[in-house]
A protein has these predicted regions:
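Conserved "HGTGT" condensation-loop signature of ketosynthase/thiolase-family condensing enzymes
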Residues: 1-103
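Single conserved hydrophobic/aromatic residue that forms the stacking wall/gate
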Residues: 101-111
């Protein structure tokens, strides 16, 4: 049996934008997500520029209590996954609940 992969929805949280519309607009208009580091003081390291996610609000996706139990990179993956889910138009039903799965390209490096 051949396994198939189907991409049903898109979501993104990245230095170029925290949603698909913003990210795509910045990409096609040549706006970079690279700038001076602001999340911490980089004076102790040689690199002072990076691609940081900016203006991201996890409370749009989960409660503050849930957010405190997760690392920031989990916030980004969760938000992108939820965006992709909404974009797909899929509905969870009793019949399909065990068949639905979400992933991102970064999860392979985390396991």
């Amino acid at each position: 049996m051949k396994r198939r992969v189907v991409i049903t929805g898109l979501g993104i949280v990245s230095p170029v934008g925290n949603d698909l519309t913003t990210a795509w607009d910045n990409i096609v208009n040549g706006r970079s997500g690279i700038s001076r580091i602001t999340r911490f003081d980089p004076s102790a390291i040689t690199t002072h520029i990076a691609g940081e996610v900016k203006d991201f609000d996890i409370s749009t996706y989960v409660s503050s209590k849930e957010a405190r139990q997760m690392d920031t990179f989990i916030h980004y993956g969760l938000a992108a996954g939820m965006q992709a889910w909404r974009d797909s138009g899929l509905e969870v039903t009793e019949a399909n609940a065990c068949l639905l799965y979400t992933s991102d390209a970064a999860d392979e490096g985390l396991g």
